[in-house]
Amino acid sequence: LTGYRTTQRTTIEGVGRRFPLERRPEDIFALGFLARGAVNRDSKDLGELQIGAVETVSTAFMGMTVGCAKCHDHMYDPIRQKDFYAMKALFDPLVIKKQTLASPAELVLYGQQVEAFSKKREAAEAPIAALTEPYRKKLYADRVAVLPPDVQAVINKSEKLRTRAEQKIADDYFPVLRIDNDKIEEVMSEQDKQKYKALRETLNQINGPTRREMVKDLPAFWTVEVDRGLEREPSYILTSGDPERPEKNNPVEPGWPFYSGQPDFREGRVEAFSDWLTANDNPLFARVAINRLWQWHFGEGLHKASSDYGIMGGRPGNPPLLDWLASEFIARNYSMKQMHKLIMTSEVYRRASSGDRKLMEKNLAIDPANRYLASFRLQRLEAEPIWDSILSAAGNLDTSLGGPSFDIENRAPRRGAAPTPEAKMNRRGAYIVRGFSTNREIVPNFLQSFDVEDGRAPCPIRTQTVTAPQGLFFMNSPEIEKASTMFADRLSKEPLPVAVDLGYRIALNRPPTPAEKDQSLTYLANDPKRLKSFAWLLFNLDEFLYIQ
């Protein structure tokens, strides 16, 4: 959506058969959208992936709330339960996989690195096993000896010869007989204990820093691919949406609402659906997408319920404008860049949020909600532009494209990995790591404070709250402390009058008023070292946070 839609994805042979071209990297990345849902990627039950895909794709790209139809026909819109599961059938053949971004040569090198590391680790583990095994056997024998004789007989019996009941007894006693390393260390001689600690320290070094030096992890990401075996299996309506309870007497064919023809699935189910969705004679996707773009620029969409174009979502405030923008979006080959330019160079976007008081009051009386945008709707910057603005003012923003995400709280991305180097913490806010995990909170406090969702469910529009954590971030966070210092260093290279003028222009995109300039110069004249406090003050002005 940031560039152009590729309209020609297949070649057509003379006999009329369609053959998919080799997938481009951006196509594989795009499919990763379906793997980013709130699903357990290690689970064998993939029903949650398909159901989540239906709900998210229909909401995000079609402006429909179809969740009701998972259990029954939609109560308001013409969407049947059968339509929901026909859409689910589109995604039924998809399975989650981890896609490695590496060339064949890189894969060979990685295999060599892993093999060399494994040999080094095995060499470090061997003396530990030799040292601990006699102690382990003695502790095990001592624990078995205090068990009842009939239990001892079961434990000493070969696992292959045990009956099912005997195996149950052995399993029940396993926690009692398990010998942990700390128990072994307790009974070691002092000499062996010192030797064991040294060996463990060496192994820990190998598993940590040494592994990171020897084995360079290949870049990879989660995506989906088509399982051809699943593609041949039938799909069914699910009782109450439960993947474990398919109604075998209610099979469904792949399809989607609002399409009465016969889909051509020779290229693929998802491909056929996406071709229909983005066809030039189908304005649905274009309306939904361009409304979201308008919402992002103006704080509210032309259709206020940007994810619900059904009966309960109401009607657009300006249908002709929405239709015209959708037609322009299609005519410009679905180029978001061109639509950004069209909107941002328009007269309505360049209006100010304040102006002649009498005229503002008159407009407010006619249009209290400012639906006709007589003036610009005052709105706070989102979290990511706030981050970018802070670093840009400090002269420390890295605008390079691509690369891994970073965590501003400098947590390791996974166990055993290294935190983000300080040099990589000045990237644009779009690269701040966010999301969810089954075992830890990933969304940084900064993003949470400024209303960024964790991504578990579609978020058609972020809330605009005003809370104490937001003010505290700008008052005393380490990020603002560092940015204020760098901003002050940037201004200190200029004479004070120029520094004051430059500070206002950089932070607020306007020159200071005469009163502001006089007050700033009076404050700084007594002590030029106050430039850091001056920079901090500019960060804490409402104008820095709000688009006016």
For the regions a language model picked out, list residue spans one by one.
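Short His/Asp/Glu-rich catalytic/ion-coordination signatures at enzyme active sites or charged loops
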Residues: 37-45, 90-123, 143-195, 507
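Acidic helix/loop microenvironments that form the catalytic cleft of cell-wall polysaccharide enzymes
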Residues: 32, 85-93, 143, 148-149, ...
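Sequence context surrounding c-type heme c attachment/ligation sites in exported
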Residues: 6, 19-122, 443, 447, ...
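Residues that flank catalytic or metal-binding motifs in active/ligand-binding sites
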Residues: 13, 29-30, 83, 150, ...
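Hydrophobic stripe of amphipathic alpha-helices that form coiled-coil interfaces
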Residues: 94, 124-127, 131-134, 138, ...
